[in-house]
Amino acid sequence: MNEKFLKLASKTLNEIFEKFNNYDSALEIDFVENNITIETENEKVFVISIHEPSSQIWLSSPISGAHHFIYDKSEKNTWISTRDKNIEILSILKKEIDSEI
């Protein structure tokens, strides 16, 4: 399970990095050891990280707070929030970052 989780989570973090690395020049993005930090021009910081013990990806957002995402392979093949099954990791990141740039 952990090997499969790490492969899926790493792929997702790579996708997030690729999406936002060239997204807007107002963003500063760092990707180090399974952690992504995205800082907006007005100093809002988003942190996305792999949490291996729980098999989750965690998001710390200055807008909506903390989210824990689990992989939903049954329906959407995406990472959904444990707080609200309608929240997907890429969707919430795009929405919140767009509101800051």
Give the label of every model feature segment.
Residues 1-101:
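N-terminal intrinsically disordered, cationic/polar leader segments
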